[in-house]
Amino acid sequence: MGTCPCESSERNEPVSRVSGTNEVSDGNETNNPAEVSDGNETNNPAEVSDGNETNNPAPVSRVSGTNEVSDGNETNNPAPVSRVSGTNEVSDGNETNNPAPVTEKPLHPHEPHIEILRGQPTDQELAALIAVLGSISGSTPPAQPEPTRWGLPVDQLRYPVFSWQRITLQEMTHMRR
């Protein structure tokens, strides 16, 4: 039929239009060592392709090549694939090419805010103490009132005393709707 690499692959999955692979790709690498399509080959010698159609009649996303409405963040493979390392792990985007696991160590250990010096309080007593201390803690200071808008330099413009323009200007300047 055609020479598209997706036809010669063993899996019958949609192929990404960006990288030509069956894996997640941002277009800068391939996750499959199979041949990569540049979108210039044709499926029929009589037809010319712009690289935006597939042999599958279902609508295809132009971003990722999947057969569903796409926002560009889905994968063809149910296992998530890291864009940097290419491994099938769930990634938070902070991975490197080093496969060794990375553990974050805090700069200093967390010290408790309340220290019990004597006795063995129960969990209910500690909860009551924390609730009382939380309720008496200072609240946020009241917000500063908005400065008055009367007496602005615009009020000193020289309009006649009975001018409708002055009244309208003052209303527009000082009255918020």
Swiss-Prot record:
Feature: compositional bias, Polar residues: 18-100
Gene Ontology terms for molecular function: acetyl-CoA carboxylase activity; propionyl-CoA carboxylase activity
Record-given protein name: Biotin-dependent acetyl-/propionyl-coenzyme A carboxylase epsilon subunit
Residues annotated as transmembrane: none
Role noted for this protein: Stimulates activity of the AccA3/AccD5 biotin-dependent acyl-CoA carboxylase complex. Interacts with AccD5 and modulates its carboxylase activity for acetyl-CoA and propionyl-CoA. Inhibits activity of the AccA3/AccD6 complex. Is also required for the activity of the long-chain acyl-CoA carboxylase (LCC) complex.
A Gene Ontology biological process term: carbon fixation
Subunit relationships: Interacts with the AccA3/AccD5 biotin-dependent acyl-CoA carboxylase complex. Interacts with the AccA3/AccD6 complex. Is also part of the long-chain acyl-CoA carboxylase (LCC) complex, which is composed of AccA3, AccD4, AccD5 and AccE5. The four subunits are essential for activity, but AccD5, together with AccE5, probably plays a structural role rather than a catalytic one.
Segments of this protein annotated with the region Disordered: 1-112
Protein induction: Protein level is maximal in exponential growth phase and declines during late log and stationary phase.
Record's comment describing the protein's domains: It is uncertain whether the five sets of tandem repeats at the N terminus are required, or not, for maximal enhancement of carboxylase activity.
One GO CC annotation: peptidoglycan-based cell wall
